[in-house]
Curated annotation (Swiss-Prot):
It comes from Arabidopsis thaliana. The lineage of its organism: Eukaryota, Viridiplantae, Streptophyta, Embryophyta, Tracheophyta. This is Protein RALF-like 15. One of its GO terms (molecular function) is hormone activity. Keywords: Disulfide bond, Hormone, Secreted, Signal. Its main location: secreted.
Length: 79
């Protein structure tokens, strides 16, 4: 029930070809182009004629965290 020798050779060559193509060097640039920098963190349809569409999105809004009165971190209530 084993594979014939010619099928093993074909499968092995196909595997080697696949691995050789997968290991090729990717063409990458060292610097960001001006085209990429023009978009920035504005909305997709940002236009100088319509400044309402150019509002930046808040990524991480400020939260003060846990206060003493909430007793959620180090304060266990024991004295």
């Amino acid at each position: 029930m084993g594979m014939s020798k010619s099928i093993k050779v074909i499968v092995s060559l196909a595997l080697i070809l696949f691995l050789a193509l997968a290991a090729t060097k990717v063409e990458a640039t060292r610097y960001i182009s001006y085209r990429g920098m023009n978009h920035g963190d504005h909305a997709i349809h940002c236009d100088k004629a319509h400044p309402n569409t150019c509002k930046k999105q808040v990524a991480n809004p400020y939260r003060r965290g846990c206060g003493t009165i909430e007793r959620c971190r180090r304060d266990t209530g024991r004295k």
